[in-house]
């Protein structure tokens, strides 16, 4: 498996054997890839902080006729030009990187930041789940509530309480979905991307 984008190809990679343990969005950094904090510091292995995945070297000049987006993605930090597409991650003591997700999709629930991809990958480890999408639903108390749209494996049923408990076994309680919606498909495109806007609308229509 590889981590990258059109703005930053070959950022990181992982290898999984048939007998290997399944892990959620974990990679080894490529030689030109670092995890940088918002103020430009390099994140050190074992740090409790999170940062943005950044690639240096042969990176694109920018986006066609979009200087604002180009300036945001392609940044010069301490004299080095970096491509920073917006993926947030943490890094273990052994250097393993755990991808959290895109900052643009981050859900703020009760003042805590939750990255949808992190919860989605964990949900997909449950034996009843084929695929999952996580969005922010309205919540009077927390502002946004973690809402999961889940596609079941053939012959399996989606049980909301089971999936919520499953996530709480792996993560802090605030990252667990408040609601779980069973769907026929999450509509993941061939490139692996999800239409979060459309999925949010589905969640709102279902819950209201």
Q: Residues of each region from the PLM?
A:
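Conserved beta-loop-beta connector loops within the AMP-binding
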Residues: 34-56, 93-94, 156-160, 195
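Gly/Ser/Thr-rich phosphate-binding loop
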Residues: 1-22, 27-34, 44-45, 59
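Short coil/turn motifs at beta-sheet boundaries
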Residues: 26, 46-48, 141-143
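General small-molecule cofactor/ligand-binding pocket signal
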Residues: 180-183
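Short coil/loop residues immediately preceding or within conserved phosphate-binding loops
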Residues: 30, 80, 129
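Acidic/polar alpha-helix N-cap and adjacent early helical turns
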Residues: 201-208
């Amino acid at each position: 498996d590889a981590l990258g984008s059109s703005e930053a190809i070959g950022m990181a990679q992982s290898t999984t054997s048939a007998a290997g343990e399944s892990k959620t969005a974990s990679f080894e950094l490529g030689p030109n890839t670092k995890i940088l904090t918002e103020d430009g510091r390099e994140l050190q292995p074992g740090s409790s902080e999170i940062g943005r995945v950044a690639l240096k070297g042969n990176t694109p000049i920018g986006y066609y006729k979009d200087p604002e987006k180009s300036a945001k993605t392609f940044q010069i930090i301490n004299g080095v030009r970096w491509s920073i597409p917006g993926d947030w991650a943490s890094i273990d003591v052994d250097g393993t990187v755990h991808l959290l997700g895109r900052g643009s999709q981050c859900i703020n629930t009760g003042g805590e930041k939750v990255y949808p991809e992190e919860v989605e990958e964990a949900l997909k480890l449950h034996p009843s789940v084929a695929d999952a999408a996580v969005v922010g639903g309205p919540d009077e108390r927390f502002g946004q509530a973690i809402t999961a749209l889940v596609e079941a494996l053939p012959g399996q049923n989606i049980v909301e309480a089971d999936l919520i408990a499953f996530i709480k076994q792996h993560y802090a309680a605030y990252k667990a979905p408040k609601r779980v919606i069973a769907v026929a498909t999450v509509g993941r495109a061939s490139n692996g991307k999800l239409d979060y806007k459309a999925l949010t609308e589905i969640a709102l229509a279902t819950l209201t």
